[in-house]
């Protein structure tokens, strides 16, 4: 118990430290924390919070970190006094109880990883941490020294939030100087995952290393590919390839040695999960995986089509559950980077080659377009721009990440492509969704290098280089103007989308890099 004195908890009844999967499973069952499915996967309900609470996330405003953090709606400031008050409250919640302490690494690169200790009173949350982070060896556990501690007091709420000037009784707070995070009022496991991701996005760029919200895989010739894209763009599907080993599906770093996964597991959406279309994820849901907010049938099988609790049903599992993964969780420098956008306006080409400067522009734009349905059945796509394809998790100014990306692209001569997995031949409602077959053909041509041999032409207004012909893709598809019957509607929509890009980018022009990068966007 002595080694846990620095946690600041009183009268702890018992500490369950780094339990095995079997031990965690026994505790989950004994504590009645959920149910087991027909194949013995444990399944929990995260309560009213079935997703992250971005409006309740704060950083303590103090020096020296205050001069690096980009303060605003995403990185909200909180005082040291209020942090201390809520940390004390969380510690009181965790005192006098049985607690679970789970130690893990974030980052598969020895020179860049961080050691994180998680403290919780819920066994399944320790299980989630064991799945999602890198599991230390026995020797590493014996010499474990935490760089950062997360207190997860999910049962603790802040009743005084109004007088404290906060948004709700939930709080997720990061104290960079003291290397502590505290979570209260939400049971959602993803807060721990994305919280440490946010911290990696603070630490690494200050060490001149890039942190990224992307998936990564590696081919038989050790050629590494990175896939960036917002939710619904096909990032997980397209990076899962039987011919390539999965490095990771969501969070990566890029240091002097190459690319490395931050995590030791995957956190996949399970809504409408189909064993035929996503056999790898379906096969990964077995003992040691942890299902969240799914609905079980009477025979304890999972009804993946049931969204009655939430659309955001999830499963976490150790990456070993994916057969074709890269065991070291790392590889060399990327050969190709692919930005995925599901453009519901039907304007972006199926594939375009980007210059280094354009890569920085489209990385900062982080564009996709979602389809919003209305009750009368009228649909108008909604443009979504998320800096660096992961704005909610980036504590520094987005141009910091873009500059690092540009430097690495140049140094390692990386090819960068923009791939549209969205609509063609018209906007949503008129055009049709790009076929997965055509998108796969574009991705394969990038990965096998055959696209480099193509003849390219300029795509007007956006000034993108697009291939004139590409094996496996109808030539008419390659330039969007050829796929629209109504050319006037095409020109109007193209100019409208270009204008959205330009307007969005104005927010980066508060720094000189932003002004510099803005030259490489669409020209209206």
Swiss-Prot record:
Mn(2+) binds at residues 194, 213, 250. Binds 1 Mn(2+) ion per subunit. The keyword Cell division does not apply. Pathway: Carbohydrate biosynthesis; gluconeogenesis. GO terms for cellular component: cytosol. It catalyses: oxaloacetate + ATP = phosphoenolpyruvate + ADP + CO2. The keyword Transit peptide does not apply. Keywords: ATP-binding, Cytoplasm, Decarboxylase, Gluconeogenesis, Lyase, Manganese, Metal-binding, Nucleotide-binding. It is an enzyme of class 4 (lyase). Gene3D superfamilies: 3.90.228.20, Phosphoenolpyruvate Carboxykinase, domain 1, Phosphoenolpyruvate Carboxykinase, domain 2. Substrate binds at residues 52, 188, 194, 314. It is found in: Cytoplasm. One of its GO terms (biological process) is gluconeogenesis. CDD domains: PEPCK_ATP. HAMAP family: PEPCK_ATP. This is Phosphoenolpyruvate carboxykinase (ATP). It comes from Campylobacter jejuni subsp. jejuni serotype O:6 (strain 81116 / NCTC 11828).
